Regions:
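Small/polar loops that bind or transfer phosphate-bearing groups
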Residues: 11, 32, 86, 93, ...
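C-terminal output/interaction extensions
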Residues: 149-164
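Conserved binding/recognition cores within well-folded domains
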Residues: 42-138
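CheY-like receiver
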Residues: 1-54
Length: 164
């Protein structure tokens, strides 16, 4: 479990009393015998739905192209004709408009908080009174987008809250 934290565990057993073990190993789902095809398919589908941000996106650092999983991008900052992405402690760029980039990014994972900044909801450590903290930096959600952000962030937290 410690080696591959992204792995979703679906525990399948004939002994219902083993559900405590499922909690102990942080199983995503518990399925008991007799197995029903629909129940197995639902468990697998739900597990796949939580695996967000794995699609790669191309960014450049010192004119070298890198394929970065979207989940690793913390913040996107728009400039005139390009965007800059904060990936961990690295700053990478891409010659693309913010509008075009938003069409490429996973909409379940990214939210545009104002005309210049897009945040990855996985990396938001706290939100209070229109202020977001991502890593060590603070960002302000525009007043116009505040209510919608709160709704989107709440839904994200309920649906994907344990995902990292």
């Amino acid at each position: 479990r410690k080696k591959n934290t992204d792995c979703k565990i679906i525990m399948a057993t004939s002994k219902i009393e083993r559900f405590k073990e499922a909690f102990k190993i942080a199983a995503f789902r518990f399925v008991s015998k007799p197995f029903f095809e629909e129940e197995i398919i639902d468990a697998l589908f739900d597990a796949l739905q939580t695996m967000i941000g794995l699609e790669p996106i191309e960014f450049y650092e010192k004119r070298i192209s890198y394929e970065i999983p979207q989940r690793e991008v913390c913040i996107v900052i728009a400039y005139d004709s390009f965007v800059e992405a904060l990936v961990g402690k690295r700053r990478m760029r891409k010659d693309i408009s913010l509008k075009r980039l938003m069409e490429i990014l996973d909409s379940r994972l990214f939210y545009q908080i104002d005309r210049r900044y897009v945040v990855n909801l996985l990396h938001v450590s706290s939100y209070q009174n229109g202020e977001i903290i991502v890593g060590e930096e603070k960002f302000i959600v525009s007043r116009r987008r505040r209510k919608e952000f709160e709704k989107v962030y709440r839904e994200f937290d309920v649906t994907y809250g344990g995902v990292k």
